[in-house]
Design a protein with these regions (language model features):
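M16/insulysin-pitrilysin zinc metalloprotease superfamily fold
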Residues: 56, 88-121
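Short amphipathic alpha-helices in soluble, non-transmembrane regions
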Residues: 99-104, 199-206
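Non-catalytic beta-strand/loop surface segments
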Residues: 1-35, 59-93, 129-184, 204, ...
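Carbohydrate-associated surface elements
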Residues: 192
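Short pre-active-site segment immediately N-terminal to the catalytic Zn-binding motif
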Residues: 33-43
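Active-site SXXK
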Residues: 44-57
Length: 232
């Protein structure tokens, strides 16, 4: 398997593999931000933002509509370390994928309405997964036993439901401009697309996006466990 790599002037890292056995192309953008980058009293933001990224950008109010018309599909997931967005699209419509992903990296549309809609979705997910099923709170109970100082001590969905309920639009914007930047992302492209075409489309859609001042990660050092920890 041949892997091609390139780093653009704005810091975006591109990884490519060509596979001519398929008529599809997959784009995957990984942002180097996860639950570990949250404030202890404002947890769940990385996961909330995963949902907000599908609320539309400045030039594309409905993210899903053009992708569906092009025969594509998409999804995303978040963990403690990264946030991952991916889509697949027929090779004949591949530029739509570059257009969609670059536009929301550059100018996500922020609105109280979008925040309220996605907040409600995330809060319902929290209730369904953590509050309304047997042993749903196991992660919330065990993580603080395993980690007492490191931010791995809270789950990706958030430490407390109130953290999402009280999230403000200004806090959401601040989170975006801190972490969602070309110099904090890896774009992986695979499928029936050449390296030359991948470079051309990345230059066209992503290269003009300016760098942002991504903070240097300074996570607290977890202390060495020297005794048994038990939850009763």
């Amino acid at each position: 398997m041949k892997i091609n790599k390139k780093i653009f002037d704005n810091g975006l890292r591109l990884v490519h593999n060509e596979d001519t056995s398929t008529q599809m192309v997959a784009l995957n953008i990984v942002y180097d931000v996860g639950a570990r980058d949250e404030h202890p009293e404002h947890t769940g933001f990385a996961h909330l933002f995963e949902h907000l990224m599908f609320g539309g950008s400045v030039h594309i109010p409905d993210y899903d509509a053009p992708l569906q018309l092009a025969g594509g599909e998409n999804n995303a997931w978040t963990n403690n370390d990264i946030t991952n967005y991916y889509l697949t699209v027929p090779k004949s419509n591949v530029e739509i994928g570059f257009w969609l992903e670059s536009d929301r990296m550059l100018e996500l549309a922020f609105s109280e309405q979008s925040l309220e809609v996605q907040r409600a979705v995330v809060m319902e997910e929290f209730k369904q997964r953590c509050l309304n099923q047997p042993y749903g709170d196991v992660g919330h109970l065990l993580r603080p036993l395993a980690y007492q100082t490191h931010p791995y001590r809270w789950p990706t969905i958030g430490k407390d439901l109130s953290h999402i309920a009280n999230a403000t639009l200004d806090e959401v914007k601040e989170f975006f401009f801190r972490f969602y930047a070309p110099n904090n992302a890896v774009l992986a492209v695979t499928g029936n697309i050449s390296w030359e075409e991948t470079i051309r489309l990345t230059e066209k859609w992503f290269a003009p996006i300016p760098r942002r001042n991504v903070p240097v990660r300074q996570l607290p050092q977890e202390v060495v466990q020297t005794a048994e920890r038990r939850q009763t």
